[in-house]
A protein has these predicted regions:
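Residue(s) in the substrate-gating loop at a strand-loop-helix junction
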Residues: 11
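Short, flexible catalytic-loop segment of classical short-chain dehydrogenase/reductase
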Residues: 15, 54-64, 68, 72-73
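Short C-terminal tail/terminal secondary-structure segment
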Residues: 16, 107-108, 119-135
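Active-site loop immediately N-terminal to the catalytic Tyr-X3-Lys motif
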Residues: 16-22, 44-45, 95, 113
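Active-site helix of classical SDR
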Residues: 27, 35
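A short hydrophobic alpha-helix cap/turn motif
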Residues: 42-44, 57, 111
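Short, small/polar-rich loop/turn modules that mediate ligand/substrate recognition or access, typified
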Residues: 43, 48, 118-120
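C-terminal helical subdomain
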Residues: 51, 75-114, 118, 127
Length: 135
């Protein structure tokens, strides 16, 4: 038996779709399905495949989103972020953008020996953003 770890990156949007992000949501939902299918195909070979679903992480992608929002609203970026959290992500309980390091910590665990009984799972790194018990 071999040994390996694969972690696919999806998004909160895979579990909690938004009408203004339909193509992105559909693509990220497909990532979850792919991870689950691959996990079933390769677990017997010792290759454990899982996924993570981050939400609103401070990154170049969300920086650009918030810059565009700030320009549209004619406000500073910090105000655009606050507006986004209040109006678009009211269930994000921590009321802040996540950090890349927080997602990396979960991925590091999933790539370690400590995750030897974790396969086909999706870990939400979402600050409480997904307003359901969906898995």
């Amino acid at each position: 038996s071999g040994w390996g770890r694969v972690v696919l990156v999806a998004s909160e949007d895979a579990l909690q779709p938004y009408t203004d992000e339909m193509p992105y949501c559909a693509a990220k939902a497909a990532v979850l399905n792919l991870a689950k299918n691959l996990s079933k195909a390769y677990a017997k070979d010792g290759v454990l495949i899982n996924s993570v679903s981050p939400a609103f992480i401070a990154s170049p992608m969300t920086d650009a989103m918030m810059q565009k929002r700030a320009e549209k609203m004619d406000v500073e970026v910090d105000q655009a972020i606050d507006s986004f959290l209040d109006n678009e992500r009211p269930h994000l309980e921590l009321q802040r953008r996540g950090k890349v390091q927080e997602v990396a910590a979960v991925i590091t665990f999933l790539c370690s020996q400590q995750s030897s009984f974790v396969v086909g799972s999706n870990y939400r790194v979402d600050g409480g953003s997904v307003a359901s018990v969906a898995v």
